Curated annotation (Swiss-Prot):
Protein name (Swiss-Prot/TrEMBL): Galacturonokinase
Lineage: Eukaryota, Viridiplantae, Streptophyta, Embryophyta, Tracheophyta
Transmembrane segments: none
Temperature dependence: Optimum temperature is 37 degrees Celsius.
Pfam families: GalKase_gal_bdg, GHMP_kinases_C, GHMP_kinases_N
SUPFAM superfamilies: GHMP Kinase, C-terminal domain, Ribosomal protein S5 domain 2-like
Length: 424
């Protein structure tokens, strides 16, 4: 594996040793990779079937048990120091606690990046996990990749969970941690996303496509027997970095999907079922889709067509057919634009540029599509040429955004990654 490097690990350990006064050899490091979703865009929150894999970039959290209940955190990317205790009861952001006070909101807390650490404690407390040890930790993300549509938030949440569990000698399964990270984002932060991100980060294996049913939580690691050609993952950044929780578009789309499900279930005599699209049979959708308002019809069409693309994509990956896999990715991108109606103009331009780049099998938005980056699968031998082409064309299309991107690197060439883990 090309990430993390020995140099990166050593730097993290030195920072924690300096903070804690402990020997560098005592420092443990959580490796929490970022994820991409080749197929399965925007359907995890509806119980759909999704695919994902991690990349060789992500979050590193060096830590030692604090020896008491204190949590002390610093970050390579963000200012300030986060300090609190694991025996403090954490409450969802904005909700009043028993004393009438409220948990600090992200806009008011000095070190807002610490909200995910508090959220991890909230999730573990909510799950009746007994936390007696805090951590002294140093957090470092891959430069320029936060808020880029690669689920850095889920990776951070997973990192804090694994560190706290390790420090407290808790045995927790990946499936349980998927639920705990969901509690951070849904319960603590109020974000209405699904479980794709944390599932990919916790379940992926190098070289495999993670295939997951978000209704049953069943998952499969699909190994490609022999790909036709080596591939790389291209990440092209738009320059839009607005945090997901401040954009009403995401939660609005979730509500629209639920409303579409409600109409279809009522029309088919199944109104007692939870209004999520996974509870609507495809035949029911075909029979009653004409009853949906135009906007709701588009959301439902994206869900059902994307589910089918995931199924076909699994078959293409398992047979080593990258060209077919790529075509499905591009079709997913088009449906995200036309049916799910997400993607600001810079992202749409990036998507179109990637489709014309040399060696690209397929491309689509990464993340929610309201900010961040686009991803592409590309022939390994043509990855450099593709990156150069995308950089040049995007600079012409969006010079203001392109000139302020990712430390001068608007396009990154990545490889597949592995699951989140603790290095002792």
């Amino acid at each position: 594996m090309s990430w993390p490097t020995d140099s990166e690990l050593n730097s993290i350990k030195e920072a924690v040793a300096q903070m804690s006064g402990r020997d560098k050899g005592e420092v443990r490091v959580v490796v929490a990779p970022y994820r991409i979703c080749p197929l399965g865009a925007h359907i995890d929150h509806q119980g759909g079937t999704v695919s994902a894999m991690t990349i060789n970039k992500g979050i590193l959290l060096g830590f030692v048990p604090s020896g008491d209940t204190q949590v002390q955190l610093r970050s390579a990317q963000f200012e300030g120091e986060v300090c609190f205790r694991v025996d403090e009861i954490q409450h969802p952001i904005g909700l009043a606690n028993k004393n009438g006070a409220s948990t600090p909101s992200p806009s008011k807390e000095k070190s807002i990046w610490g909200t995910y650490a508090r959220g991890a404690v909230y999730a573990l407390q909510s799950s009746k996990k007994n936390l007696k040890q805090g951590i002294i930790g140093y957090l470092s993300g891959s430069n320029g990749l936060d808020s880029s549509g690669l689920s850095s938030s889920a990776a951070v949440g997973v990192a804090y969970l694994l560190a706290l569990e390790n420090a407290n000698e808790l045995t927790v399964s990946p499936t349980e941690n998927i639920e705990y990270d969901r509690l951070i984002e849904n319960g603590y932060l109020g974000l209405r996303n699904g479980i794709l991100d944390q599932s990919a980060i916790l379940l992926s294996n190098y070289g495999c496509l993670t295939y997951m049913d978000c209704k049953t939580l069943d998952h499969e690691l699909v190994q490609a027997p022999e790909l036709e050609k080596p591939f790389r993952i291209l990440l092209a950044f738009s320059g839009l970095r607005q945090a997901l929780t401040t954009n009403p578009g995401y939660n609005l789309r979730v509500s629209e999907c639920q409303e579409a499900a409600k109409v279809l279930l009522t029309a088919s005599g199944n109104s007692e079922l939870e209004p999520t699209l996974c509870n609507v049979e495809h035949a029911v959708y075909e029979a009653h889709k004409h009853e949906l308002k135009p906007v709701l019809a588009k959301r439902a069409e994206h869900y059902f067509s994307e589910n089918m693309r995931v199924i076909k994509g699994r078959e293409a990956w398992a047979s080593g057919n990258l060209e077919e896999f790529g075509k499905l990715i591009s079709a997913s991108g088009l449906s995200s634009i036309e049916n799910y109606e997400c993607g600001a103009e810079p992202l749409i331009q990036l998507y179109k540029i990637l489709l014309k780049a040399p060696g690209v099998y397929g491309a689509r938005f990464s993340g929610a599509g309201f900010r961040g980056c686009c991803l592409a699968f590309v022939d390994a031998e043509k990855a450099e040429a593709a990156a150069s082409y995308v950089k040049d064309e995007y600079e012409k299309a969006q010079p203001e955004f392109a000139n302020n991107l990712n430390g001068g690197k608007p396009v990154l060439i990545c490889e597949a990654g592995d699951a989140a883990r603790v290095l002792l």
